[in-house]
C-alpha cells in the first residue's frame, strides 16, 4: 500500500505543475519526454555504479508559473524546516531558501561559507556559457579543401555530439550526422572527378588538455567523464562504468574515413599535426561580452536570429557541413545528465570565444568572471574546472541561489532555458530515482542540480510549494556519507514542498 501511495503522490505532484502549465504533459498539450537515466558522480573511494545510456534530448522548457500567490514568510519557513534542519546530516550544512519571484531570502544558514560545490558548479557554468553564445546558436562541423585537390580537412567546430550515421532533427545528442557530412563530401568530390584523398583534421579551434590535473586519474577510465575535445560522437558519450574514448577526435576521424570509403573513395588518413592551410590559432569573432555590473541579457529565443559558430581555418572551399542542436539545448542536456565532459566542452569554447585560455583552470576563472559580470558577488569563489569534478572548487550557497533566482525571475532568458534542463524529482536525469519514498511529496515538483563527491554533497534548484509558489533552495553538506546526505537533502526539499509557510 505504501508503494501505491508513493506512485499516486508522484503523479499528483506532477499534475500540480502540469495544471499550472509549469511542466510538460497532456494537460498542457505537450508530450512527456522520455525519462533520462540517472548518472552517479563517483570519486576515488566510491564504488562505481553502471549506468544506462545517457539521454539524447531533454524535457520541454517549463514556462513560469501562472497566477499570483503569496510568498512564504521567513518565520514560516523556519518553523516548517526546524525538524529537518536538526537531523545530524544537516546541522553543519549550508542552506539557503529564497522566493523564486522576488528573490527574497527566506532562510540563510551558513550561506556565505565557501564549500566544495561538486556538480552544482554547472549552474555557474551555465550562466557563463549563456553569455557567450547567442540564443539559438549552433555549432558547425565543416569539411573543406586542403592545399591540393586531393587533400580534405575535417575542421573540429565544437560539436561533441555527432551522430555516427544519419542525424536526427529531433535529438540533441546526434542532431548533426557524420554520415550526412560524408554524403555531402563524397558527392562534391565525385562531381569534380576526385576518387582518392588524404584526410586531415584541424583541431586548432579551442584545443586544450583532455582531462584536468585536479581530477582523479580514474575519472575518465571509469566513465565519470569523457575526454574534453572539440569533436566527438554521441554514441561514445561516457557514463559511469563505461568509459568513452581517450581521444574522441581520433575516433571521429577513423569513423569519417570509413564512411567515405563506404561511399567509394580511397582515403589515406594523415598523421596528427597541423592541417593544410590552418593558422596557428584560429579565433572566431567573439560575442560581445557585457562588463561587470551591466544589465543582464534580455534577448529571448523567439526573437533572436539563430546563428552558427564555426572556426574559419583556411581558404579552401567548403565541401560539406552539418550543424548541431542549439548550444542552449546542449547545455540543458548537460544539466539533465550531469554530463561533465559536455559541460567542459561548452565552457571551453565559450571562454575561447571571449579570448580566455583553454586550460581547465583558465576556463574556471573565466566562468567566475562571467558570473561576476552579471552583477553577482563572487568574492572568494574559485573554480579549477567548469564541471565540478575538482575538489579545489569553492563556492557559496548564496551565490548558487543568486544564479537560480537570476534564471527564474526573467532577467536572463538564456539561463532560464538552460535551467529547464534540470532533472525533475522522481522522473528524469539524476533525480529519476530520488523523491520516491517518504519524501515523495516533492516528486514532480522539484527541479534540481545534484552534486556528489566524497564528503561533499549538494542539491540546488527549485520546488513548488503547497500554495503554488516557486521557491529556490540550495543545500550543501560536508563530511557526511553520500546516502545520509542525499536522504537529508531530499527530506529538506520535501518539507519545503509541503509548506505554505506564511
Please place each PLM-identified region on the residue numbering.
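Hydrophobic single-pass membrane-targeting/anchoring helices
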Residues: 1-35, 42, 197
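N-terminal low-complexity, Pro/Thr-rich disordered segments
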Residues: 22-79, 268, 273-314, 432-438
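Beta-lactamase-like hydrolase cores
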Residues: 36-113, 135, 182-193
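Active-site SXXK
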Residues: 103, 117-135, 231, 255-256, ...
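Short, well-structured active-site flanking segments
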Residues: 132-148, 269-270, 415-418
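Active-site-adjacent helix/loop patches that line small-molecule binding or acyl-intermediate pockets
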Residues: 141-219, 227-252, 325-366
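A small/polar active-site loop signature that marks catalytic segments
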Residues: 227, 234-416
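Small-residue-rich helix-loop
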Residues: 351-502
